[in-house]
């Protein structure tokens, strides 16, 4: 102790006497003497990148065992840690099993003198490293390729498209006829109308009203002497209103003080083909309270639906006629209900 405190005491040079630090440095230099055994993904590209620059800074110097980055070199004295590309470090987080496996490999390499594991000598691809990684959805960038990989890793459930309740979306009833009534609010001379109006027929011995027709929209009107008029033959609600106004305008031009009041739709007729034959005998036995089938009088089955209040004519080929509706939606609702019933009585060809 007195010799150390004396002014003549000098610290021996590092290069003169071998110390345990020099021995560990020699062993570390022997481990790093074969750099070709460690696989670096950036070594395939001759151009310097950010990954290769970081790896070059982390490699120890051959003379003094100190790294070029911070000059400490403490982490390289106890073994070489396999390098992973920065893209994988940022995008994935090692699982607990993978960390435990890496710790065992490091312990084995330190016990056996720092030999490189065989797995590090093989080229690693992102697909091979994917098995030990867990995706970090919060930190990972929204990449299309990574999202596809995540979908394959998670449990996949088949998605079934939504289907309508009863009717096929391709089978929709079409309106064939709309019957509407209107009040002209004046007494009419039917003989004068038949003589001066075009396309008008009047035969009081056979039929009391005047029958008048127009081409656009293609409809027929029944004009009574009381001032009431019935318009039939339109394919839609707007066409029925337009046709009734045209008939009222013709009456006004003939000198009558006709008005246009109380237009009401009295009946809608729809037609639809279910595209399969129907067993009418089985249907009338099962739904005897709502149906009537007399093939000697009428070849089709008459089905009277309570709600909505619609009458359906069901012939055997499957072309359904719906009548008695006041609104278009009643036609659609009635067909949805009858279609689910008709599927049970489909005739096997």
Swiss-Prot record:
Example GO biological process: transcription by RNA polymerase II
Name of the protein in its database record: TATA-box-binding protein
Biased composition (Low complexity): 46-60, 90-111
Species this chain originates from: Drosophila virilis
Biased composition (Polar residues): 112-130
Stretches for region Disordered: 1-22, 42-142
Quaternary state and interactors: Belongs to the TFIID complex which is composed of TATA binding protein (Tbp) and a number of TBP-associated factors (Tafs). Binds DNA as monomer. Interacts with TFIIA-L heterotrimer. Interacts with Taf1, Taf2, Taf5 and Taf12.
Keywords tagged on the record: DNA-binding, Nucleus, Repeat, Transcription
Gene name in the database record: Tbp
Domain of life: Eukaryota
Gene3D superfamilies (alphabetical): TATA-Binding Protein
């Amino acid at each position: 102790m007195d010799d150390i405190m004396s002014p003549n005491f000098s610290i021996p040079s590092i290069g003169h006497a071998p110390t345990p630090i020099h021995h560990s440095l020699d062993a570390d230099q022997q481990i790093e003497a074969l750099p070709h055994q460690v696989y670096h993904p950036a070594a395939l590209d001759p151009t310097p990148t950010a990954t290769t620059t970081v790896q070059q800074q982390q490699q120890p110097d051959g003379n003094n065992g100190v790294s070029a980055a911070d000059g400490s070199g403490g982490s390289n004295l106890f073994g070489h840690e396999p390098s992973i590309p920065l893209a994988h470090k940022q995008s994935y987080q090692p699982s607990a099993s993978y960390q435990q496996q890496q710790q065992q490999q490091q312990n084995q390499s330190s016990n056996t003198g720092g030999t490189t594991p065989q797995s590090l000598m093989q080229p690693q691809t992102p697909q091979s490293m994917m098995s030990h990684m867990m995706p970090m959805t919060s930190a990972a960038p929204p990449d299309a390729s990574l999202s596809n990989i995540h979908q394959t890793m998670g449990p996949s459930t088949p998605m079934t498209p939504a289907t309508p309740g009863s009717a096929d979306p391709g089978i929709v009833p079409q309106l064939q006829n709309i019957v509407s009534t209107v009040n002209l609010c004046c007494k009419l001379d039917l003989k004068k109308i038949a003589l001066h109006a075009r396309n008008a027929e009047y035969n009081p011995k056979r039929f009391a009203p005047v029958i008048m027709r127009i081409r656009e929209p293609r409809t027929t009107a029944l004009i009574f002497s009381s001032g009431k008029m019935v318009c039939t033959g339109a394919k839609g609600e707007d066409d029925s209103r337009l046709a009734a106004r045209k008939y009222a305008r013709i009456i006004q031009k003939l000198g009558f003080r006709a008005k246009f009041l109380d237009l009401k739709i009295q009946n809608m007729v729809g037609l639809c083909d279910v595209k399969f034959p129907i067993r009418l005998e089985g249907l009338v036995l099962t739904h005897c309270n709502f149906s009537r089938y007399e093939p000697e009088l009428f070849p089709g089955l008459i089905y009277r639906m309570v709600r909505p209040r619609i009458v359906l004519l069901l012939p055997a080929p499957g072309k359904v006629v719906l009548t008695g509706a006041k609104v278009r939606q009643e036609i659609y609702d009635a067909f949805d209900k009858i279609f689910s019933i008709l599927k049970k009585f489909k005739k096997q060809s």
